[in-house]
Every structure is written in structure tokens, then in C-alpha cells.
Amino acid sequence: MAFKVVVSDTKTGKSYQFETESTALIGKKIGDEISGSVVELEGYKLKITGGSDKCGFAMRHDIHGAMKMRVLLKEGPGYNVKEKGLRRRKSLRGNTISKDVTLINTKVVEYGSAPLGGEPESTE
């Protein structure tokens, strides 16, 4: 099982995508801090901010566990309110990373010594 890990740089506003086969991410929750060495970013510390599963369902921080649920929402992640007071039942994934999750969103909390984007490409 491969995870796509999107790392957002809060200083520059850019994001970088990495792939990893690491099983160290399984069982982690939204809000947990992980080492950047999971995605070969030595010295970095990353905070998990969200993700989505293999069917495209978003993870939500207030649904505990790794299962998929149909919840009634009036606002927040996973639901875009069209009218005031409108509620809707949506399928969402829980806040724990499992083998069904394919995309993990993170942001940088502590920076390492190497630049995040690697070597800039030459424009020849």
C-alpha cells in the first residue's frame, strides 16, 4: 500500500508531493506530528491535517476511528453549505489513517537543514 503525502510549506505557500510505502503512518490521527524521515525529509517535523481514501472520501477530524460513515453535516470539512440552515448527509472517513487511505495532507511544523523542494531545476 502506497501513500501519497502532500507536504505544505507554510512559509512559501507551496506544496510538494511524495510517495511512501511506510507502514509507520497507519494508526496516526489528524493533528498528530510525525517525523519527516517517513518521506525522506530529514530533520523536518510534519503535522497531519487531513487526507482522503481510495474512493475519494475526505477524512474529518471529529469522526473518531478509521471507518467510513454517513454523517449529518451543517458546516465544516467535507461539506460546502449552499443555503443558510441547510443540512446534508455525507459519506466521510474517520480521523485515523488506515490501509484504505491513499492521500495524506501535512504541513511543516519544524524545518530541517536541507531545502524542502530539493535542487531547483535549471531552465535551459
From Swiss-Prot:
<dbReference type="GO" id="GO:0005840">
    <property type="term" value="C:ribosome"/>
</dbReference>
<keyword id="KW-0689">Ribosomal protein</keyword>
<comment type="similarity">
    <text>Belongs to the eukaryotic ribosomal protein eS6 family.</text>
</comment>
<dbReference type="GO" id="GO:1990904">
    <property type="term" value="C:ribonucleoprotein complex"/>
</dbReference>
<dbReference type="InterPro" id="IPR020924">
    <property type="entry name" value="Ribosomal_eS6_arc"/>
</dbReference>
<dbReference type="GO" id="GO:0006412">
    <property type="term" value="P:translation"/>
</dbReference>
<dbReference type="Pfam" id="PF01092">
    <property type="entry name" value="Ribosomal_S6e"/>
</dbReference>
<dbReference type="GO" id="GO:0003735">
    <property type="term" value="F:structural constituent of ribosome"/>
</dbReference>
<keyword id="KW-0687">Ribonucleoprotein</keyword>
<protein>
    <recommendedName>
        <fullName>Small ribosomal subunit protein eS6</fullName>
    </recommendedName>
</protein>
<dbReference type="InterPro" id="IPR001377">
    <property type="entry name" value="Ribosomal_eS6"/>
</dbReference>
